Every structure is written in structure tokens, then in C-alpha cells.
From Swiss-Prot:
Disruption phenotype: Females are sterile. This is Vitelline membrane protein Vm26Ab. Follicle cells. Residues 24-42, 155-168 form a propeptide. Residues 117-154 form the VM domain. The keyword Disulfide bond applies. Residues 43-46 are annotated as: Essential for N-terminal propeptide removal. Potential serine protease cleavage site. Changing residue 123 to S: No appreciable effect on egg turgidity. Slight reduction in egg turgidity. The gene is Vm26Ab. Keywords: Disulfide bond, Extracellular matrix, Repeat, Secreted, Signal. Proteolytically processed after secretion into the perivitelline space. Undergoes several proteolytic processing steps during formation of the vitelline membrane; an initial processing step removing a C-terminal propeptide occurs between stage 9 and 12 of oogenesis while a second removing a N-terminal propeptide occurs between stage 11 and 14. Its main location: secreted. Interacts with vml and Vm26Aa; forms part of a disulfide-linked network within the vitelline membrane of stage 10 egg chambers.
Length: 168
């Protein structure tokens, strides 16, 4: 069976919903294996903060026991050290420095220029939706014919030619 990202996502969602919905509480007869130092840290921190309603545990440190009697040790042997060797230092290596790297500067950014403008197509004159005005104003001396008329506009009714589109 191939493993893919979908399986990982589903497993993550199931695990997240299980963890977020309830806290898993182990019974005293159940257990998990954890390293001893980690278990000791957990035990100490639970005791320090009153975990499980128990009184804080006493620290697990005890002072070393006092010696029972004076221990006997033999007299120390005379210390012997070899004569000091003459100090030797290697001759200093000649100082070397790499040649300086040539100074580099990035090429200058090109000056900004506005993009070339795209010419608009010519305005159709006889289509249904056109950029040409369909109502032509007339001089204000023309009398209005009635209250509901076009007023200063002529009674010109534009004729539209809808382009014929043939399907293939």
C-alpha cells in the first residue's frame, strides 16, 4: 500500500481530535516505558507542585556519612620530576595575506519606464453597446414638447445594427 500525504493528513487529524477531545488517564496497573532520568524529573516536579493531591516529597538528597575512624595512609613517596627540557619555539612562519579581492558592485538597476501603452480599438458606431452617445443635445432654444418628453434632447431614435454571428 502506497503512503501519501493524504494518509498523513488523516492520521494527524484523527490524533489531534483524540488529544483535543479528552485527556488520556492511565490506570495504576497500566504503564509506559520512559527513561529513568525523565521519570525522576517527573516525580520530582509532581511532588514539588503537589501532584495528585499528595504532600510535596522531601528532597532525595542525604548528606555523606562521617568517617568512622581515622584512616591510615602510608607516608607519601618522594616526588620526582624530570629536569625541565629547554624551551624550544619553532621559527615564525612568514606572514602571508591573500591578495585583496577586487571591489564588486552590482549592476545599476535600470531606470523605470512606464509600459508601452496599448492603443484602444476604434469605437464602433452602430453596435448595441457603443461608446458613442446615442442622445444628441440640441440648442436650448428648442421648446420642450411636453412634460414627459426628452427636454433638451432631440427625438432622434438611434437605429442599432446587431452584428450577425453564425455558429460553426
Amino acid at each position: 500500500m502506497a503512503f501519501n500525504f493524504g494518509h498523513l493528513l488523516i492520521a494527524g487529524l484523527v490524533a489531534l481530535s483524540a488529544v483535543s477531545s479528552e485527556t488520556i488517564q492511565l490506570q495504576p496497573t497500566q504503564g509506559i516505558l520512559i527513561p529513568a532520568p525523565l521519570a525522576e524529573n517527573i516525580r520530582v516536579s509532581r511532588a514539588a507542585y503537589g501532584g495528585y493531591g499528595a504532600a510535596p516529597a522531601a528532597p532525595s538528597y542525604s548528606a555523606p556519612a562521617a568517617p568512622a575512624a581515622q584512616a591510615y595512609s602510608a607516608p607519601a613517596a618522594p616526588a620526582y620530576s624530570a629536569p625541565a627540557a629547554p624551551a624550544y619555539s619553532a621559527p615564525a612562519a612568514p606572514a602571508y595575506s591573500a591578495p585583496a579581492a577586487p571591489a564588486y558592485s552590482a549592476p545599476a538597476a535600470p531606470a523605470y519606464s512606464a509600459p508601452a501603452s496599448i492603443p484602444s480599438p476604434p469605437c464602433p458606431k452602430n453596435y448595441l453597446f457603443s461608446c458613442q452617445p446615442s442622445l444628441q443635445p440640441v440648442p436650448c432654444s428648442a421648446p420642450a414638447q411636453s412634460y414627459g418628453s426628452a427636454g433638451a434632447y432631440s427625438q432622434y431614435v438611434p437605429q442599432y445594427a446587431v452584428p450577425f454571428v453564425r455558429e460553426l
